[in-house]
Structures are given as C-alpha cells and as structure tokens.
Amino acid sequence: MTQFASPVLHSLLDTDAYKLHMQQAVFHHYYDVHVAAEFRCRGDDLLGIYADAIREQVQAMQHLRLQDDEYQWLSALPFFQADYLNWLREFRFNPEQVTVSNDNGKLDIRLSGPWREVILWEVPLLAVISEMVHRYRSPQTDVAQALDTLESKLVDFSALTAGLDMSRFHLMDFGTRRRFSREVQETIVKRLQQESWFVGTSNYDLARRLSLTPMGTQAHEWFQAHQQISPDLANSQRAALAAWLEEYPDQLGIALTDCITMDAFLRDFGVEFASRYQGLRHDSGDPVEWGEKAIAHYEKLGIDPQSKTLVFSDNLDLRKAVELYRHFSSRVQLSFGIGTRLTCDIPQVKPLNIVIKLVECNGKPVAKLSDSPGKTICHDKAFVRALRKAFDLPHIKKAS
C-alpha cells in the first residue's frame, strides 16, 4: 500500500483547538505525568489491512513542526503563554510512542509516553486513518460531491428555518477527526463561511488560514487523567474543573459534562464553578433531557441561564441542530458543533466511527462513563466499580 504514500498532514496546527489548550495546561501543571491511550473502532469495520499505510503516515508526522508564521499567529491569541509556545516550537511527534498493528483484521493502535507529548497524537492520527481508509475505499470520490451534498442540505436548512429568528443560532465546524479528507474539510468550511450563522472551526490550521475563530476548550481526557492525578477519586472531577480555571481563569470556559455522566457532573458543579464557567458542552445522551437538566441546575443555583451557553456536539446534523435551537433558543445561549455530518457527508461513503481514548494515567486505569453506554471505555472492571461507587452511580452500565 504505497500508492498513496504522500503525507496526509501538512501542518502541526491541523488539529482541534482544545488539544493545544489542554497541552498548555498539561505543560504548566502536569509536565511529568505519563499516559496511555488506545484506538477504538465503534463500528464493524475491519481496518487492520490499513496498518502499514497508517504506520507510514505516523513516521511522516515526525517532520511536522510549528512554522514561524504559525508561531506568530498563536502568539497573538489571548490563550497562550510564551513559555508554552517556545516549547511548542521545538516539539516534534515521536513515532516511537505509537504502535500500529493488524490484529486479525482489526486495527490496533496504542499510544504511550509523557502526557504533554502524547496529547497531540489523537486528532491528526484519527484524521490520517479516516483519510487513508477513504482514499482506498472511494478513490473516485472528490470534493465536488461533498460540496453538492452540502448545498442540498443548505437548501433544506433554509426551508426548515424560514420565518425562524436565527440571530441566536451559532454553528461551528468540529469535523477534523473523521473528515473524508483535508481538502473536503477546507472546502466545506469555506462554503459555510458565507453563512452569517457560521462562527468558527475547531481546526487551528483552518482558523489561521481562513481568518476564523478557533473553537474548543477541553476533552474527556482532561477529566479522566485527574482520576489518577487527584489523591481522592470522588474529588477528581472537581479537581479537573479547578485546575482548568487555574490555567484559564477568564476564558475557554465551556465545561464538558459527560466523563462520568451529567448527573454526577452537576453534583460537582456548584455555584462557584457554575458562575465562573461560561457554559456546558453536551457530548452524549439525550440532548433535550441534558439541556433541561442544565437550565434547571442554573436556575436552582440562582444563575440566569440566559447568561450561559450550552454547546451541543454529539452526532449532530443541521436538522437536529435546528430542532434543538427551536426548543432552547428563548431560554439560553446556544452553539452547535457539527463534525462528521459536515466533513464526511458524501453519497455512498460510510463515515468511520473511530476514537482514541485515554486508558491509563501514571500506569493506573482511567475510565469514561458517559451518558451513552456504548461510549464507555475501560479495561479494569474493578476501577469502574470504584468509580461508580465514588460518584454514587450504582446503575451505570458496565464498561465495554
């Protein structure tokens, strides 16, 4: 499999914004923490045959580095400190941190090393896997087909929103990790830029080159790692929320709620956190139920929900986003992050349902017990039981 050996990636910034935001926080607070992460294909795709091609791409990634113009652009953003950016200038991907193999047809990938370095592998590696697989499966598919599909969806979207006040509707591109290709994502984002309700992208490379706002705060791994960083498991989620505010006291204030279910999150999300964080992000479970819980929680704490933002990002498409907007727009600020349904929405192309998730921190297990049982990941059943007990979740379904 060498016919497509040219590198998929061309920029270190071709990744999700929250990876750099988290990396800076890890650089400042957890420099010596080590982690391990593993690849999962949630579908039935046998991707092992692509292992050699993916391994080639992993090797090519060691040549990526922060360019001078990229460094200058990051320096002008309010999020980053000079010590981190100077370190990032010297950063190089280390392929020795990645093992890729074909396990009886299944693609097996494991990452391990210092968290400050390993943290950057996930998004570009998933984008590489997605693009390599689609290159082989759909060699005749091109950007025009993706754009035609989007134009058709935008016509439907206009009809769906006719007569609706869309002034509070905000859409973001979250499509890097499962995109059909880098070229498709850029084309889709350029088209969406023409719409007044499109507010930005999670992709730092596209944000820089297209003069867009980079969007993103933190991911599940921030909360998962704290399960072992925090000396008290029951306090680990609060420790993660507090450490984030230490790094970003006045910005990047959207908290992810489903590392250990929304109910457990809200028990930890008291009035100080709820006041200081700008809002919450939904990534699993029923979105209407979740949003109602969030609004009720703010009201219970005496906080006006209209002063907060709910971000929906779980398996969204334009139609679902409009339904949620109709339901919630009069009561709370809203943003919608759409990924796969924008950047891999092409007839006859099956998007990959692939993830890379943290499984260990400092040699000990971590877990994600989300509001969608199929998204649960952990090897260690005893640790899952301990986590359920610590967060008073006796009925959570077992880890898969």
Swiss-Prot record:
A molecular function GO annotation: nicotinate phosphoribosyltransferase activity
Catalytically driven reaction(s): nicotinate + 5-phospho-alpha-D-ribose 1-diphosphate + ATP + H2O = nicotinate beta-D-ribonucleotide + ADP + phosphate + diphosphate
Superkingdom assignment: Bacteria
Keyword vocabulary terms for this entry: Ligase, Phosphoprotein, Pyridine nucleotide biosynthesis
PTM: Transiently phosphorylated on a His residue during the reaction cycle. Phosphorylation strongly increases the affinity for substrates and increases the rate of nicotinate D-ribonucleotide production. Dephosphorylation regenerates the low-affinity form of the enzyme, leading to product release.
Family, per entry: Belongs to the NAPRTase family.
Protein name (record): Nicotinate phosphoribosyltransferase
The gene coding this protein: pncB
